[in-house]
Regions:
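Single transmembrane alpha-helix segments in multi-pass membrane proteins
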Residues: 20-83, 107-117, 132, 259, ...
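Loop-to-transmembrane alpha-helix initiation sites
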Residues: 41, 116, 143-146, 161-170, ...
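Alpha-helical transmembrane segments within multi-pass membrane transporters and channels
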Residues: 84-125, 331, 336
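Transmembrane alpha-helical segments in multi-pass inner-membrane proteins
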Residues: 102, 275-286, 292-358
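Transmembrane helix-bundle core of multi-pass membrane transporters
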Residues: 124-241, 297-298
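Membrane-helix/interface signature in polytopic inner-membrane proteins
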Residues: 181-197, 236-275
Length: 374
């Protein structure tokens, strides 16, 4: 069987199997409350994984993102809670810090020809130390008392029911338009066009799934705003990788960096740009993860780099670069989130969680090596 077909079948089946197992062990797993919680967690892992996807496409890796999530979230929390900065300004400062730090790392990698593994491993330790210094090894809330601000609302705000349904309808309409344009483009280039019935059936499936998901979320509090952050990030990364020269350069560099350089691609600038975008993903994830915790603590971001890498590789992104899709990353992140959420719901011991995460990461790398040969 073709390896692409095998992977495409394996991922949905793995997700169904994981969800089925946890639902059998604990029916509340598929309840509105837990699914909403799962989606918030998925938004955090998925956003970080999308940033990691851009790095892995070029054949690089970033081991510093977990510590960076804690550091950037901590910077914003300190500015809000200890220095009375308005939340939007504090979040902007955190984003600026992330852009500076990740552009510096990217610059070091390309200017000094140091492997990204080494630079980002150092970043992991440096950022962790800076994080603990920034929060002074204490707990820093993201807001004062019971007051709400933009920071705290990142994972606690839910769309009103009517807005969620309207948004689902809008997304369904956009999908229909994109499908129509894709068919028109294939017809214009005299390529094979799938039957109308298949296209309409596929669109109806997505539309029903979208409305069903919103109805399910409305059974608790509504669609979490963090899901919109993930959706916007995914849409941006999809457009970047599929419809811009920068995205094509990422694939080319990962496929063969020497050939990319000889063909005139500005390899150094593209790599620095990829790391800067990784910094944006780290900042967004840091804000959401810290808000989800309610405060910046020394454990925020722990091991998230491994979850992001595993999500990418499970979804078909090659560690050697040059191969991967946004949809695969999203599916890989969903599998990782379902696994972690289910273990938490079943009150699995922390040591078993570590073993499971390590096993999943090892399996993901094995899949990359074995299936990548096909």
């Amino acid at each position: 069987m073709n390896t692409r077909v095998l992977r495409n079948l394996a991922l949905p089946l793995a997700l169904v199997a994981i969800c089925g197992f946890f639902a059998f062990k604990e029916p509340a797993f598929l309840g509105p409350r837990n699914l909403t919680q799962l989606v918030v967690e998925f938004s955090m892992i998925g956003t970080l994984a999308l940033g990691m996807f851009l790095i892995l496409l070029t054949g690089q890796i970033d081991l510093s993102v977990g510590s960076g999530v804690g550091l950037i979230g901590g910077i914003a929390a300190v500015l809000v809670f200890q220095h009375d900065w308005p939340a939007p300004l504090a979040l902007g400062a955190g984003l600026a810090a992330a852009l500076v730090l990740w552009s510096l790392m990217g610059g070091l990698i390309v200017s000094q020809r140091i492997p990204s593994f080494i630079i980002t491993l150092g970043g992991l330790l440096v950022f962790k130390g800076l994080f603990w210094l920034v929060i002074d090894n204490s707990t820093i809330p993201v807001s004062r008392g019971d007051e709400e601000n933009l920071y705290s609302l990142l994972t606690t705000y839910y769309l009103p029911s009517s807005v969620g349904l309207a948004l689902a309808g809008l997304v369904a309409a956009v999908l229909a338009l994109l499908s129509f344009r894709a068919r028109a483009a294939r017809r214009a280039h005299r390529l094979g066009v799938p039957p109308v019935a298949r296209a309409v059936g596929g669109w109806l499936g997505w539309a029903v799934a979208l409305v069903g998901a919103v109805v399910l979320f409305n059974g608790f509090r509504g669609v979490p705003v963090s899901l919109l952050v993930l959706a916007a990030t995914a849409a941006g990364v999809f457009f970047l990788t599929r419809h811009t020269p920068f995205g094509r350069y990422l694939y080319a560099i990962g496929g063969n960096q020497e050939a990319a350089l000889l063909s005139g691609i500005p390899v150094n600038r593209v790599l620095i740009g990829a790391f800067m975008l990784m910094g944006v993903a780290v900042a967004l994830t840091g804000f959401m993860t810290t808000a989800f915790s309610g405060a910046s603590t020394t454990t925020v971001g722990d091991l998230m780099e491994l979850d992001a890498i595993a999500a990418c590789v499970i979804g078909g992104t090659a560690l050697r670069g040059g191969r991967g899709t946004v949809s695969g990353v999203i599916l890989g992140a969903l599998i990782m989130t379902a696994l972690l959420n289910g273990m938490t719901l079943l009150a699995v011991a922390p040591e078993i969680k570590f073993i499971a995460r390590g096993a999943v990461l090892a399996l993901a790398v094995w899949m990359d090596v074995r299936l990548g040969r096909g």
